[in-house]
């Protein structure tokens, strides 16, 4: 179940419409799409993109996105902990970070000006667009299992720009 956790009030939201409204009020786009494809752990990037082409292609065309790829994070990945550490550091991007979760789950953390830090646990079917310049970090968890389609205007825009704030250190105990 998709959840949104507010660290200051310790309130957890579970209603998709309420989560969408909360995120929208902070400039973050959130939708839920169907995920009918039955994907194996070994499904290739081409297989995953083909399985969702009927919704992905029109979405990309309507929003000016040029390319997509698949991130497949699971416990069998070599050096997962080192990879996880890169995602766990607060950063921004020079373009929107758009992810469509097709399997598993992951935790997006947000540190927005004027708002207490909060996180969104995204799962299969969730589409989230983190606006460019938004301070955030991502956690696939200590035992990862997530397949997500990454959607780009320009793949160079995905390069993380680390803030160096280390605010994420305060929240390391909260994970999937």
Swiss-Prot record:
Its cofactor is Fe(2+); Ni(2+). It comes from the Bacteria. It is an enzyme of class 1 (oxidoreductase). The record marks 99 as: Important to generate the dianion. The keyword Disulfide bond does not apply. Fe(2+) binds at residues 91, 93, 97, 136. One of its GO terms (molecular function) is nickel cation binding. The record marks 96 as: May play a role in transmitting local conformational changes. Coiled coil: none annotated. The keyword Ion transport does not apply. It holds the Pfam family ARD. It catalyses: 1,2-dihydroxy-5-(methylsulfanyl)pent-1-en-3-one + O2 = 3-(methylsulfanyl)propanoate + CO + formate + 2 H(+); 1,2-dihydroxy-5-(methylsulfanyl)pent-1-en-3-one + O2 = 4-methylsulfanyl-2-oxobutanoate + formate + 2 H(+). The record marks 90 as: May play a role in metal incorporation in vivo. Catalyzes 2 different reactions between oxygen and the acireductone 1,2-dihydroxy-3-keto-5-methylthiopentene (DHK-MTPene) depending upon the metal bound in the active site. Fe-containing acireductone dioxygenase (Fe-ARD) produces formate and 2-keto-4-methylthiobutyrate (KMTB), the alpha-ketoacid precursor of methionine in the methionine recycle pathway. Ni-containing acireductone dioxygenase (Ni-ARD) produces methylthiopropionate, carbon monoxide and formate, and does not lie on the methionine recycle pathway. Monomer. Belongs to the acireductone dioxygenase (ARD) family. This is Acireductone dioxygenase. It comes from Picosynechococcus sp. (strain ATCC 27264 / PCC 7002 / PR-6) (Agmenellum quadruplicatum). The lineage of its organism: Bacteria, Bacillati, Cyanobacteriota, Cyanophyceae, Oscillatoriophycideae.
């Amino acid at each position: 179940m998709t959840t949104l956790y507010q660290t200051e009030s310790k309130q957890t939201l579970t209603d998709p419409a309420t989560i969408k409204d909360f995120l929208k009020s902070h400039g973050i786009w959130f939708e839920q799409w169907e995920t009918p494809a039955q994907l194996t752990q070994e499904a290739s990037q081409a297989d995953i993109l083909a399985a969702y082409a009927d919704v992905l292609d029109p979405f990309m065309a309507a929003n000016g996105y040029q390319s997509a790829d698949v991130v497949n994070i699971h416990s069998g990945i070599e050096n997962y902990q080192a990879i996880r550490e890169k995602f766990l550091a607060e950063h921004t991007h020079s373009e929107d970070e758009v992810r469509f979760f097709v399997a598993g789950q992951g935790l997006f953390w947000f540190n927005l000006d004027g708002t207490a830090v909060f996180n969104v646990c995204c799962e299969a079917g969730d589409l989230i667009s983190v606006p460019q310049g938004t301070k955030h970090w991502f956690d696939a968890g200590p035992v990862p299992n997530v397949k997500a389609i990454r959607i780009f205007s320009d793949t160079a825009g995905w390069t993380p720009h680390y803030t160096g704030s280390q605010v994420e250190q305060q929240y390391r105990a909260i994970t999937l």
